[in-house]
Amino acid sequence: MDFSSEDAFRAGAAALMDNCLSLGLNTVLVQVRPFGDALYRSSLFPWSHLCTGVQGQDPGFDPLDVLLTEAHSRGLSLEAWVNPYRLKSSASLPGTIAPDNLICTHPDWICTAGEGVYLNPAIPEAADYV
């Protein structure tokens, strides 16, 4: 999807929803919390790097709102897919961590596995945050 502007994103979202309809689908599943960040305006999580290439940078519009509008205008339902624990999957995703990412704000809540960084659900405060 093209996040360069709201109009470009809306055009991509419309094409996606039209394709879903042509396939006979009635529900679209959208990942909205990929790396401890969000593809929607949030007071708890920084903007996803998938929006602008930089985690924490506001794209100037709410991608989830656009997706919801385009889905609902076609009679499609939309379900949000949330990764509640994954904060980073490798040395390159996301490349730069926003200062308000949980890796920075609560380093005592994280654990690592391979190249991944995760919120540790065994820590009560981290589990409550989710």
Task: Enumerate the predicted regions with their spans.
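Catalytic domains of carbohydrate-active enzymes, especially glycoside hydrolases
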Residues: 11-38
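Aromatic-lined substrate-binding rim segments of carbohydrate-active enzymes
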Residues: 16-17, 34-83
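Hydrophobic transmembrane alpha-helix bundles
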Residues: 15, 19, 65-71, 115-126
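Conserved, mostly hydrophobic/aromatic
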Residues: 20, 28, 71, 78, ...
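Glycine-rich loops and low-complexity Gly/Arg-rich segments
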Residues: 23-24, 52-56, 103-106
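Active-site-adjacent "subsite" loops/lids of carbohydrate-active enzymes
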Residues: 1-10, 79-80, 85-130
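Aromatic/hydrophobic pocket-lining residues that form the small-molecule binding cavity
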Residues: 9, 13, 60, 64, ...
